Structures are given as C-alpha cells and as structure tokens.
C-alpha cells in the first residue's frame, strides 16, 4: 500500500532555515507523502518555508489567526494563543487545508519545528 498523502501544518519561529524544516519533515512525516504545506499567514513569506515548498513542488497555504482559532484541535496551546492569537497553528492549518482532515499526525515538535498532518483527499 502506498504511503498516505497528507498536508503538513507547520508552526515555526521567524528565520527557521530550509535545512531545519527539511530535517523536521524527514523525521516527522517520513511515513507519508506530502501533498501540501500550511501555516499561519504571518509566516507565509518565511524564506525557509518557501524554499521547502518549492523544493517539494507542493502548494503552501496560509490562514489568518482568526481562521485558525475556530478550528477544534486535540492539542491546543496557551503559549501559542498568547504568541500568535490562536491556540493552534500546525494542527489547525493542516485541518483547514484539507477541508477537515482527518488528522493523521497530531502536533509534534521536531528540531524546533511544530508539525501536524491531515489526510489529503483529492
């Protein structure tokens, strides 16, 4: 059976390098095929994230904190809410980008990058 296609939601700090993001994806979602990336709008133009999306030849979707904040997620974070105005970036972005999931990889931090993945359906 081929690996499932997923959209990976990503939360990261400003200035995170493409190499760090690639390493996190290799380690964090190795059992899945990446069909897209998603994040919060304020990180949409991060050079490292743009480079990884281009390398993978997948779309990068972004959502406002307001859009992300209405998504029910299993692992909300108070620190995230305080920092960016929503309790979830990675899980909520993955779920929004896929139209509701399901979430196949709950939030995890790999090399300082927060990852979550939701099943991509064509």
Give the positions of each predicted feature.
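Structural motif
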Residues: 5-8, 35-36, 61, 101-104, ...
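Alpha-helical scaffold segments in soluble metabolic enzymes
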Residues: 24, 51, 91-95
